[in-house]
Swiss-Prot record:
Protein's name according to its UniProt entry: Peroxidase 22.3
Top-rank lineage group of the source organism: Eukaryota
MF GO annotations: heme binding; lactoperoxidase activity; metal ion binding
SUPFAM superfamilies with a match to the protein in the record: Heme-dependent peroxidases
Encoding gene per record: POX22.3
Protein's UniProt keywords contain Calcium: yes
Species whose genome carries this gene: Oryza sativa subsp. japonica
Classification via InterPro entries: Haem_peroxidase, Haem_peroxidase_sf, Peroxidase_pln, Peroxidases_AS, Peroxidases_heam-ligand_BS, Secretory_peroxidase
Record-listed heme b binding positions: 189
Pfam families: peroxidase
EC number: 1.11.1.-
PROSITE patterns: PEROXIDASE_1, PEROXIDASE_2, PEROXIDASE_4
Sites where a glycan is attached: 112, 171, 205
């Protein structure tokens, strides 16, 4: 009986793995070449204009894609009003919805109900990085949009700014991403800003931090909880609006803003990867683009699954 049960379990796992593989295989760089040939150029024009107007928007759009993919897969669930948007890691900090809505409206005007919000998010992430001087990559397409979202999963599946190295490795591993992917994707913190409430404990209580850097950050982040919680500081103090490898050099100098940044270089298993990325921009770019493609393949809805939303913030009626 035990043998039969184990065989059945093994078969189920194989089937599940095969289904996941098929879903990823259904994504294609040429998915819209016939159905909406101007989709990518239309999205790019919207994203590039938005990032040129406000550099921080590039980081916000990249973060939207990350927070989408880590919660029930890359399915645009993060764009549905409420639910995931109300989760602790997202509330009061997610931005860029209007830019995605604008891109969606522009695409709908040329190809009605053809291009998914999930694909727009994936393309927007790539175009944001490029607009800030970072590397490009081929975005695989064909995702469909979910009809549900989960605040509970957003609270459990998204990494916290207080995460340890082991917690980060485990969190990413559960999404099919290895430790190198995790360190590379953390390099997205070469752009963007963080709220005081997410780095207060680090700048006042941690010892593995450059003292001058801590003092600089304390000037705009008071010690008392509730005072200046939403005040912002750049995640990369060196080149905050350029997508480069300076983030890793900052870690070598103990100038990581978040606890979850500095744990990447603190005598642990990720130290050598951080050193490599700090000294070799090409190695970082290669690892980052590889990891972005892998992240974009997390549990996509394809074929007849889900829907193509008419409005990214709500399911079709």
């Amino acid at each position: 009986m035990a043998s039969a049960t184990n065989s059945s379990l093994s078969l189920m796992l194989l089937v599940a793995a095969a289904m996941a593989s098929v879903a990823s295989a259904q994504l294609s760089a040429t998915f819209y070449d016939t159905s909406c040939p101007n989709a990518l150029s239309t999205i790019k024009s919207v994203i590039t204009a938005a990032v040129n107007s406000e550099a921080r928007m590039g980081a916000s759009l990249l973060r939207l894609h990350f927070h989408d993919c880590f919660v029930q897969g890359c399915d645009a669930s993060v764009l549905l009003s409420g639910q995931e948007q109300n989760a602790g890691p997202n509330v009061g900090s997610l931005r860029g919805f209007s830019v995605i809505d604008n891109a969606k409206a522009r695409v709908e005007a040329i190809c009605n109900q053809t291009v998914s919000c999930a694909d727009i998010l994936a393309v927007a992430a790539r175009d944001s990085v490029v607009a800030l001087g970072g590397p490009s990559w081929t975005v695989l397409l064909g995702r469909r949009d979910s009809t549900t979202a989960s605040e509970a999963l957003a609270n459990t599946d998204l990494p916290a700014p207080s995460s340890s190295l082991a917690e980060l490795i485990g969190n990413f591993s559960r999404k099919g991403l290895d430790a190198t992917d995790m360190v590379a994707l953390s390099g997205a913190h070469t752009i963007g800003q963080a709220q005081c409430q997410n780095f207060r404990d680090r700048i006042y209580n941690e010892t593995n931090i450059d003292s001058a850097f801590a003092t600089q950050r304390q000037a705009n982040c008071p010690r008392p909880t509730g005072s200046g919680d939403s005040n912002l500081a750049p995640l990369d103090t060196t080149t905050p609006n350029a997508f480069d490898n300076a983030y890793y050099s900052n870690l070598l100098s103990n100038k990581g803003l978040l606890h979850s940044d500095q744990v990447l270089f603190n005598g642990g298993s990720a130290d050598n990867t951080v050193r490599n990325f700090a000294s070799n921009a090409a190695a970082f770019s290669s690892a980052f683009t590889t990891a972005m493609v892998k992240m974009g393949n997390i549990s996509p809805l394809t074929g007849t699954q889900g829907q193509i939303r008419l409005s990214c913030s709500k399911v079709n009626s």
